[in-house]
């Protein structure tokens, strides 16, 4: 199994308290990350602000040796087609070749935040991935709050995963967005995901995105690797909002040693 390193310092890490990257900051950090050898650099969310869009346009002029630039976004809004969604169209305009979009997995958020039916959420996941794939993008799908969603309604969380895979996502990223998981929970849930994928003949690569509110983000990521998860979403020094993410600077040396 080849492990791929997906650095989200410039997107998720930029949400840290007292951190505000300029366009030039992001470009220089991206060049350093490329020199370091990471596979993917999530440069920002082009649909959220002009600064991030400008960063993508500047980054498109770089000749990177190792990394691919990734544009972040979300599934389409309710009541509109994917091609009408400004957030998805911003990804197209970013000049990136890889998109990482997130969508709801926890039914509580589907019903209370999005205010849509479970079926409508599944349709938004499918529509958004198919739209970007149709435009030539490699699409990673972040299953936001996957672990909480799984604990609340396993069947629905796995259905979100299945729909994303069938729509053409090349990586299904299991997210502990609240950061509350413990290593034994990660071991159990990822094992069940593997069984579900085997049973349903889903061969899509798995990724992991862990927050550190419980203090176990790096350990949880390590557990996921042992269960065959290939894409690791990390930040330099674990920088991100609240308590941080899995730490690239700790995890890579640990992986080298195993």
Predicted feature residues:
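Catalytic cores and adjacent flexible loops of soluble metabolic enzymes
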Residues: 1-258
């Amino acid at each position: 199994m080849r492990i791929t390193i997906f650095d989200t310092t410039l997107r998720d890490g930029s949400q840290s308290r007292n951190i505000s990257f300029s366009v030039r900051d992001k470009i220089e950090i991206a060049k350093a990350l490329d020199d370091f050898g990471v596979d993917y650099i999530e440069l920002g969310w082009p649909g959220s602000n002009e600064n991030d869009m400008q960063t993508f346009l500047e980054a498109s002029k770089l000749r990177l040796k190792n990394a691919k630039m990734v544009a972040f976004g979300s599934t389409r809004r309710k009541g509109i087609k994917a091609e009408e969604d400004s957030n998805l169209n911003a990804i197209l305009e970013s000049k990136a070749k890889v998109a990482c979009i997130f969508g709801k997995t926890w039914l509580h958020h589907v019903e209370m935040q999005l205010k849509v039916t479970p079926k409508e959420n599944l349709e938004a996941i499918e529509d958004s991935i198919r739209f970007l794939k149709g435009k030539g993008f490699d699409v990673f799908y972040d299953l936001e709050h996957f672990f909480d969603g799984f604990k609340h309604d396993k069947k629905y969380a796995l259905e979100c995963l299945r729909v994303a895979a069938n729509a053409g996502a090349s990586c299904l990223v299991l997210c502990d967005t609240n950061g509350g998981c413990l290593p034994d929970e990660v071991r159990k849930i990822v094992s069940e995901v593997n069984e579900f994928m085997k049973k349903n003949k889903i061969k899509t690569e798995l990724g992991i995105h862990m927050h550190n509110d419980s203090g176990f983000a790096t350990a949880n990521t390590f557990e996921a690797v042992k269960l065959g998860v290939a894409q690791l979403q990390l930040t330099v020094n674990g920088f991100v909002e609240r308590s941080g993410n899995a730490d690239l600077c700790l995890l890579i040396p640990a992986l080298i040693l195993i």
